[in-house]
Regions:
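Conserved N-proximal alpha/beta basic substrate-recognition cap immediately N-terminal to
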Residues: 1-60
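Catalytic phosphate/metal-binding cores of nucleic-acid and nucleotide-processing enzymes, i.e., regions
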Residues: 175
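Conserved residues at the C-terminal ends of beta-strands
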Residues: 10, 66, 133
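A short alpha-helix capping/helix-coil boundary motif
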Residues: 26-31, 74, 137-139
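Phosphate- and divalent-cation-binding pockets in alpha/beta enzyme and binding domains
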Residues: 16-18, 96, 116
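ATP-dependent carboxylate/phosphate-activation module, predominantly the ATP-grasp catalytic core
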Residues: 107-168, 172
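A ubiquitous structural signal for well-ordered alpha-helices
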Residues: 21, 97, 159-163
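Active-site nucleotide/adenylate-binding loops and adjacent lid/helix of ATP-dependent enzymes
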Residues: 37-113, 121-127, 153-154
Length: 175
């Protein structure tokens, strides 16, 4: 007889299913640590996520609308990790990928290392803990080789505080 205390889905694709109202009502007496459907959709869609973060005063890469500057990043609006992200060097490359990917964002290209912050938020919206990782090798959008980093902890802490003040984020979240 095993007793389940809490279920923590770790993939944003799993969360899509678990936030649906008919599934939510059957979630093992609400023992699943997960945010509501609307907030999940906000964070899962890159465009709405950047707007949400910017509204909290959190710096995000510039979304290019009118002025296209190469190189740039083309990324799918929906998704997680680095899946569907393309570095675009020329107008020809841009034309090619715009035909292949229907819903996308064009973003400024930032040179340097890629970091991700893994967070776990309590049901009341406070952050239980977070970890900064450098993404060193990617496969299928996820980091297959990463290294923990204590860089930027003060800056990350201030971002986490802004996210906590919303009271809307619950469960595992990666930024």
């Amino acid at each position: 007889d095993e007793k389940i205390d809490v279920i923590i889905p770790v993939s944003s694709y799993d969360m899509n299913a678990f936030t649906e109202p008919e599934v939510k009502s059957k979630r093992l007496d609400n023992k699943m640590l997960i945010m509501d459907k609307e907030m999940h959709r906000t964070l899962h869609n890159k465009e709405s996520c950047y707007h949400f973060l910017a509204g909290l005063g959190i710096c995000t890469p510039e979304v290019l609308v009118d002025q296209i500057r190469f190189p740039l990043i083309l990324k799918q609006k929906e998704g997680s990790g680095s899946k569907g992200i393309k570095i675009i060097e020329t107008a020809e490359d841009l034309g090619y990928w715009k035909k292949k990917i229907s819903e996308y964002l064009l973003m400024e290209y930032l040179e340097g290392k890629e970091y991700t912050v893994d967070c776990l938020f309590r049901d009341n919206g406070t952050c239980l803990g977070w970890n900064v990782r450098e993404r060193m090798k990617m496969n299928g959008g996820g980091a297959v080789i990463s290294q923990n980093s204590n860089l930027y902890n003060q800056k990350v802490s201030k971002v986490i505080e802004k996210l906590e003040r919303t009271g809307k984020i619950r469960g595992p979240v990666n930024f």
